[in-house]
């Protein structure tokens, strides 16, 4: 702890950019490295989950990411469930962002588009298209709307439910209505639930005790796109937050006699090096935003915005352009080949090589790699 004033202390924490991996074992061939992981009954070949935003995930994007071994999470409260012509609406939004550099213009339009009511038929149709393609189907809902939307999603045939907000606790208390008790909610479902975000050890442990199959660390913090620090004074030191959640996972594993809850890191991961460091800190998988937004398959056409940017009264994000001109395919973003020397393409290839250089063959073992603070 560091004293920041008389009688007030704060904890020293670390960002991913402040740490480095330290190889200390025999190196291996990257061809011998496995990046596979399993969430409940569902196996994925790469530890990559798409952040649930309309800037990324359409049914087509989710299908392609699933085909490549990852998981695309549809935003159940986004534009896809509100507008039949979602492509035209997104194009309108991008046009506004390109014409007017002031972020408020595009955010205002985004709020207007989200003011349209959710259409269960549109949402169910989008889910069905993903399911029919044979890939794992996951949809995100907020804690506030989880009880209302989940029956619609279950009827459409989802495999995984993601209950996600900027900050999620085991119980969401509301004086004006019935609180959401995640433990009760999850126990009544037949599908696995991933919940988050959390920023600390205690909240992560509490979420694990609800029966969640996975816990999301962070809220998708993205330079130039998310503004939770400016609006709420809340930010996430991802290296520390991931390590704390991993410690909660170990504690819960001992507490239950072997139940393993997966940790998903969501925020401040832009390159393959940061992806590798997130895994090294204890994450089982990462949730990516801007790295995937540059792909040709992303719905946002090279633009990214978080779901919180559409909040009707307190937006906590803006539109950010991530790619100009010809955009790489999702295959190239994830698996290469890359002509970019800064780690923004061939993300999984970079992770494999980092693991191989450090002498590890699988993700769980790689969580034990040595780390140093480099500040």
From Swiss-Prot:
Top-level taxonomic group: Bacteria
Pfam families with a match to the protein in the record: IMPDH (PF00478)
Keywords: NAD, Oxidoreductase
Enzyme Commission code: 1.-.-.-
Molecular function as annotated in GO: IMP dehydrogenase activity
BP GO annotations: GTP biosynthetic process
Matches recorded under PANTHER family: INOSINE-5'-MONOPHOSPHATE DEHYDROGENASE, INOSINE-5-MONOPHOSPHATE DEHYDROGENASE RELATED
Name of this protein: Uncharacterized oxidoreductase ML0388
Source organism per UniProt: Mycobacterium leprae (strain TN)
């Amino acid at each position: 702890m560091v004293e920041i004033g008389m009688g007030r202390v704060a904890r020293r924490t670390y960002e991913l950019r402040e740490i480095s991996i330290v190889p200390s074992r025999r190196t291996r061939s990257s061809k011998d490295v496995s990046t596979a992981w399993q969430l409940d009954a569902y196996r994925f070949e790469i530890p990559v989950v798409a952040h649930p935003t309309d800037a990324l995930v359409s049914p087509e994007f989710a299908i392609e990411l699933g085909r490549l071994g990852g998981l695309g999470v549809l935003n159940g409260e986004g534009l896809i469930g509100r507008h039949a012509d979602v492509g035209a609406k997104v194009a309108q939004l991008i046009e506004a962002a390109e014409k007017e550099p002031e972020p408020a213009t595009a955010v205002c339009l985004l709020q207007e588009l989200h003011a349209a009511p959710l259409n269960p038929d549109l949402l169910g149709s989008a889910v069905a298209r993903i399911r029919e393609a044979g890939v794992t189907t996951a949809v995100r809902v907020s804690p506030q709307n989880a009880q209302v939307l989940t029956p619609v999603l279950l009827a459409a045939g989802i495999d995984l439910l993601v209950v996600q907000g900027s900050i999620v606790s085991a119980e969401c208390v509301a004086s004006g209505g019935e609180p959401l008790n995640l433990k009760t909610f999850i126990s009544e479902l037949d599908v696995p639930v991933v919940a988050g975000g959390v920023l600390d050890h205690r909240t992560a442990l509490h979420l694990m005790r609800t029966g969640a199959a996975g816990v999301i660390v962070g809220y998708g913090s993205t330079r130039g796109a998310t503004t939770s620090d400016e609006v709420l004074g809340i930010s996430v030191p991802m290296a520390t937050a991931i390590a704390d959640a991993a410690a909660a996972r170990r504690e819960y594993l001992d507490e239950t006699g072997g139940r393993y809850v997966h940790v998903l890191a969501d925020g401040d991961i832009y390159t393959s090096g940061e992806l590798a460091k997130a895994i090294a800190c204890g994450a089982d998988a990462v949730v990516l935003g801007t790295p995937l937004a540059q792909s040709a398959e992303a719905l946002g056409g090279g633009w990214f915005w978080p779901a919180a940017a559409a909040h009707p009264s307190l937006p906590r994000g803006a539109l950010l352009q991530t790619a100009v001109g010809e955009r790489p395919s999702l295959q190239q973003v994830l698996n290469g080949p890359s002509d970019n020397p800064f780690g923004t393409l061939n993300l999984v290839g970079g992770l494999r090589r980092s693991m191989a250089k450090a002498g590890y063959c699988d993700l769980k073992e790689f969580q034990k790699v040595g780390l140093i603070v480099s500040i």
